[in-house]
A protein has these predicted regions:
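Conserved, well-structured functional cores that handle cations and Mg-NTP chemistry
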Residues: 1-149
């Protein structure tokens, strides 16, 4: 098997190792399923992620889509709580880092995303934390959002 293939088992091991006991096992499974769905999706919509998950697991598409929808509407799963595990995981072996803070406008939907990236030696950037905000709420608040990230 190609070592770069992201399987349910491999993603589950990674996510479980990252969040440890801070997230219920069923939530770890839901996050794992969503990650595998995203990696195998053609776009990032609930339907496409569910279809990607169904393709990998053999589930019926409607059931996989429902799983993704339930995860995203579950208020007990906090993105910021997951970031608290993601960032130390990515930075664990690093003694010194260079980061970039970037705003990206999405004119079509009236949103902006601010992201903090780890700049790597090979010229790419790994996203550490990000947040999307409505452009209409940016005025005089850009620095506040940057501080939050």
């Amino acid at each position: 098997m190609n070592r770069n293939v992201i399987t349910i088992k491999r993603a589950g091991h990674l996510i479980d190792g990252m969040v440890g006991e801070s997230l219920h096992a069923k939530r770890v499974q839901s996050v794992t399923n969503a990650v595998v769905g995203v990696v195998n999706a053609v776009s990032v919509s609930i339907h496409a992620i569910g279809a990607g998950l169904a393709q990998v697991t053999g589930l019926q598409a409607k059931h996989a889509i429902k799983q993704v929808d339930r995860l995203l509407s579950n208020t007990a799963v906090s993105v910021w709580g997951l970031f608290a595990h993601w960032v130390p995981y990515v930075l664990s072996a690093t003694k010194e880092i260079v980061v970039a803070l970037d705003w990206t406008d999405f004119d079509a939907d009236g949103h902006c995303t601010i992201a903090l990236y780890l700049v790597t030696a090979h010229g790419r950037a790994t996203p550490l934390i990000w947040k999307s905000v409505k452009k209409s709420k940016l005025k005089r608040r850009r620095n506040i959002y940057e501080d939050e990230v």
